[in-house]
Amino acid sequence: LQYDMVRVGLCAYKGAMSVISEVVDARFVRRGEIVGYGGSPLENDTNVAFVFGGYADGICRESPHGAWIGGNYCKAVGIACMDVFAVDTQDYIAKIGEKVTLFDGETALIAANERKTVEYCVYTAFSRSRSVCKKI
């Protein structure tokens, strides 16, 4: 058999797509205080950053993946809301307006593993997000 067609699959996205957001609020939260949609109590005192983006944008509601803020990986806490989700920044104090990387070509597999899915689902989940295309 001889074919003249190639299916590129993930090669079309890998390394070419990043999802960047920003911190919309950050605060110290005490153990037992409620964070996220439906109210998930925190197990420890910690710093929490609230990131713009929620299930309306393609963030998994029940188990949002974490994000990178200030070079630190921050695990998600609570259930994502329609427009915001929370991450535990631990000792790092995030600033309002600070850049947040949800994933990029290097970290999409981590996001997929946290959501117990494949990279393709992470790349294609985003809906109303503003796209920025750069010529390379």
Regions found by a protein language model. Name each.
Residues 1-136:
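Active-site anion/phosphate-binding pocket segments in diverse small-molecule metabolic enzymes
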